[in-house]
From Swiss-Prot:
Gene3D superfamilies: Transferase(Phosphotransferase) domain 1 (1.10.510.10). InterPro entries: Kinase-like_dom_sf, WH2_dom. This is Probable inactive serine/threonine-protein kinase slob2. Residues 366-386, 450-574 are annotated as: Disordered. One of its GO terms (molecular function) is actin binding. Belongs to the protein kinase superfamily. Ser/Thr protein kinase family. The keyword Membrane applies. It is found in: Membrane. The protein kinase domain is predicted to be catalytically inactive. PANTHER family: FORMIN 3, ISOFORM B, INVERTED FORMIN-2. Its main location: membrane. Keywords: Glycoprotein, Membrane, Transmembrane, Transmembrane helix.
């Protein structure tokens, strides 16, 4: 028995030694293979060689772009940080500033390519200036990380941003998983640790204040996640809000597409960040929102998450309502901005276009391609906005308002919403004319059928306007006298295309109507003509008949009417 026992032990030992030798040989071969240069050994390896060469050339091109850009700025390139973020096409570099304090010199520069089909006009200098101004305007808020430098390289279609690097804490995701910020992204989030309840409450309230500030200023974000929240000495700073202006896909885009109709995107993103802080890991997929919250989550945080993901009676909760909940309301901050930001019309147009583009991208059920032509363009958005402003003017043609006298020409046009002038012609409906009737309606021409009374009234008014203020007491009697004498002799107006002829003066002959008198050049009325005893000559179609009829008019023949002055105060007799 002992003989067989020794044989078994020797066989096992020999097998173990042989296995160890094989493992060592394989590892040595693997390390030697990695040290060898990338050369094609046979025809089957040509594709692999070309692929590796393209990757190497791409990295060299990225480094060259970074060096060329930083050549004319105040920063100097230090090194490239490999596999720093979750985006494969976004490259990070360590950058040194020129400050005397070494702790302030540590910077992170990010370079990300932008699609050529993205319609926001960043290729022009005016568009880049507007983009920088919008991004820099948020530096007044204490919970927003504003980049030290933000720019766009039109030749390379690459966006550049430089931010301070918080080496102690890093991002909120680094703070949750207790990992080093500069570790490779695939290796530093293996451990899962949940934060303290008080820290979750404090960080959550700080993020809420920043989101409410952006919401009140109609600022597009859509990119909230724990990796885009920086931690600096127990203070959370949201960052990377410029991604929405560059057409980058948000990390939570699948969640937003799934629950876009039920939950606001910013509220949903905040709920996912709160879930990661309280549970220690990121929510896996959009369908996990409808599943019950884990048992190890804090009870107070559970109430907030249920209010976000499972709203009461289907009413979605807002950011302001979340900030008033007991879990966040007891935190008070004194350094919040009190005044609102003001933006120019160009800046507001760019922000509105970014919001519409991102909402269109996130409202589709399937992920659109970068070359998808169904994505709305900036020209279409401007056309829609212009069409919305001109809704009122589509049913009316732009018509200039005409005036008979010189005094009404200055204020004769009334603009509507589209900037067109509205004419009081008979082509418009009568109820529309009643709404836009000017104050001095007798000075404007109407193409509708008028009666002789209105014509005579305008004639008597034009006659009486030639007198001075000394004969104002006889105005009413003159009007009645002219109406009674000319009602039977005036012929009806001749229908003619616009502009219509002026009403004829009172005359006993049935000749053609004389032309209207020229408008006076002075603003005041002319002096009254001297009375004449000669009878007025008959109207022969010339201006002489009208002038002689006006000169023959005498105010001495008018009778003064007795008027009762009721403008004074009423006194009671004792």
């Amino acid at each position: 028995m002992e003989y067989y026992y020794y044989i078994i032990i020797a066989a096992v030992g020999g097998f173990a030694i042989l296995t160890f030798i094989i493992i060592v040989v394989l590892r040595l071969k693997k390390s030697q293979k990695m040290r060898e240069p990338l050369l094609p050994k046979e025809k089957g390896n040509v594709f692999v060689y070309k692929r590796d060469t393209q990757v190497q050339e791409k990295e060299e091109q990225v480094m060259m772009n970074a060096r060329l850009y930083l050549r004319s700025t105040i920063y100097s390139l230090q090194d490239k940080i490999p596999k720093f973020g979750s985006r494969s096409d976004k490259v990070y570099f360590g950058v040194l500033g020129n400050s005397l304090n070494k702790l302030e010199n540590d910077r992170i520069m990010a370079m990300v390519p932008v699609s050529k089909h993205w319609p926001i006009p960043l290729n022009s200098e005016a568009g880049r200036t507007t983009f920088r101004t919008i991004i820099k305007s948020l530096e007044i808020h204490p919970f927003i990380s504003v980049p030290l430098l933000v720019d766009f390289i039109p030749e390379k279609h690459v966006a550049v941003s430089v931010r301070p690097f918080y080496a102690d804490r890093g991002s909120l995701r680094d703070f949750i998983h207790k990992s080093k910020p500069k570790m490779p992204y695939a290796d530093k989030y293996d451990t899962h640790l949940q934060l303290n309840e008080k820290i979750v409450s404090k960080f959550g309230r700080q993020i809420l204040e920043a989101l409410i500030f952006l919401k009140n200023h109609n600022f597009p974000y859509f990119h909230l996640n724990s990796a885009n929240v920086l931690v600096d000495d127990q203070i959370c700073l949201i960052s990377d809000y410029e991604n929405s202006f560059l057409g980058l896909e948000p990390r939570f885009s699948d969640f937003i597409r799934q629950h876009n109709e039920k939950i606001d995107p910013d509220v949903l993103s905040f709920g996912l960040v709160l879930f990661e802080m309280a549970c220690g890991y990121e929510m896996e997929n959009p369908h996990s929102v409808d599943i019950s919250i884990p048992a190890h989550c804090y009870p107070e945080v559970r109430k907030v998450l249920e209010a976000i993901f499972k709203p009461f009676y289907g009413t979605p909760i807002t950011l302001e309502e979340l900030s008033k909940m007991d879990f966040f309301s007891y935190h008070k901050f004194k350094n919040l901005p009190l005044h609102r930001l003001t933006y120019t019309s160009r800046e507001r147009d760019m922000m509105d276009a970014v919001i519409k583009l991102n909402k269109t991208f996130l409202s589709t059920n399937s992920k659109p391609n970068s070359k998808d032509l169904s994505q709305p363009k900036l020209k279409d958005l401007k056309k829609q906005k212009k069409r919305k402003q001109l809704v009122f003017t589509q049913s009316f043609e732009p018509i200039k308002m005409e005036s008979q006298n010189g005094g009404g020409a200055a204020g004769g046009e009334y603009g509507n919403e589209g900037g067109y002038a509205i004419s009081t012609s008979s082509s418009l409906p009568s109820n529309f004319l009643a709404n836009v009737k000017p104050a001095n309606s007798t000075s404007y021409s109407l193409l509708s059928n008028t009666t002789t009374n209105t014509t005579n009234t305008s004639t008597s008014s034009s006659l009486n306007s030639s007198f001075n203020s000394n004969v104002s007491t006889s105005y009413s009697n003159a009007t009645t006298t002219t109406n009674t004498t000319s009602a039977s002799s005036v012929s009806p107006p001749i229908s003619s295309p616009p502009p219509p002829p002026p009403p004829p003066p009172p005359s006993k002959s049935s000749g053609p109507p004389p032309p209207p008198p020229p408008p006076p050049k002075s603003s005041g009325p002319p002096p009254p003509p001297p009375p004449k005893s000669s009878p007025p000559p008959p109207a022969d179609g010339s201006r002489k008949g009208l002038l002689s009829s006006i000169e023959s008019f005498s105010s001495s023949k008018l009778k003064k009417t007795k008027t009762v002055d009721k403008s004074g105060p009423l006194l009671k007799k004792s």
